[in-house]
Regions:
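FIC/Doc superfamily catalytic core
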Residues: 1-273
Length: 273
């Protein structure tokens, strides 16, 4: 187990020419999406639609699969007795996302919010694990990583992560920091279950906290599904070789591609008769 996971910030050059060039294009795509949603008087319906799709995609990464049809039926009749367990789990994710969005208006993103998101996603009342965590496996079912298994280490690492999220020493671009935060949370893997989903909610909440978005509209799950083996390879390369470059470029590309895709989808929704 990786009990000696290095604390943040990473001892590596995060602002290479290649990374900075990609940061510019990712920020531009994100700013265009931000500008468009900012101009909408009432984007709530749009946000509900997009967040339902994210809940579905993010859960799919964890092999919790439902159909759009089941999802929208359950969303419009949440008290129905015939909702499948998978669909319920997807709806819990959506609720957790909106809960987090409302919470970060009042307090900074940190350990307490992480635990509350876990409670919402998994509908259970325990918290940071005391037992060995689930290993991370790639698309071929090979173990790529075994997270820390000592609760004191987990709490120490989470406390360090919380500090990194809220104190930007060195004035590093928030999108580069997003990649670092996502890597670190995935590696700490603090909960008995639901870590991937909680981590992906943290991504969008961080962008909102950094004022790069006003509302939870950008989700990386569909990109991760499409490029899943690259995701695990880049993650593993940081752990094994301290190669941050490919991981950061992967996350920056995910932000850029997803921002453009989301904006196209919104424009289509708002301009179609």
């Amino acid at each position: 187990a990786y009990n000696n996971l290095p604390i943040l910030p990473p001892h590596a050059e995060l602002e290479t020419v290649q990374i900075l060039k990609k940061t510019v294009s990712a920020n531009k795509a994100l700013a265009e999406l931000h500008g468009w949603t900012y101009m909408q008087a009432n984007p709530l319906l749009l946000l509900q639609t997009v967040s339902l799709q994210e809940a579905k995609s993010s859960s799919e990464i964890e092999n919790v699969v439902t159909t759009n049809d089941d999802l929208y039926k359950a969303f419009s009749a949440p008290d129905s007795k015939i909702i499948s367990p998978s669909t319920k789990e997807v709806l819990h994710y959506k609720d957790a996302l909106w809960y987090g969005f409302n919470e970060i208006k009042q307090r900074p993103l940190g350990i307490n919010i992480f635990i509350e998101l876990f409670h919402k996603v998994k509908q259970r009342s325990d918290g940071i694990r005391s037992l060995p965590g689930t290993v991370l496996k790639n698309s071929y079912d090979e173990t790529v990583y075994t997270p820390p298994d000592n609760k004191d280490d987990i709490l120490r690492l989470l406390s360090n992560l919380e500090n990194y999220i809220n104190v930007n020493e060195g004035n590093i671009d928030p999108l580069i920091r997003l990649a670092v935060i996502h890597y670190q949370f995935e590696c700490i893997h603090p909960f008995p279950d639901g870590n991937g989903r909680v981590g992906r909610i943290i991504n969008v909440l961080y962008l909102i906290q950094e004022k790069l978005l006003d509302v939870p509209i950008l989700y990386l799950s569909s990109y991760i599904i499409e490029h899943k083996s690259d995701y695990y390879k880049a993650l593993q390369d940081v752990t094994e070789y301290a190669d941050w470059t490919n991981w950061i470029l992967y996350i920056l590309d995910a932000v850029e591609v997803t921002a453009k895709k989301t904006l196209s989808m919104i424009c289509l929704l708002y301009t179609s008769p």
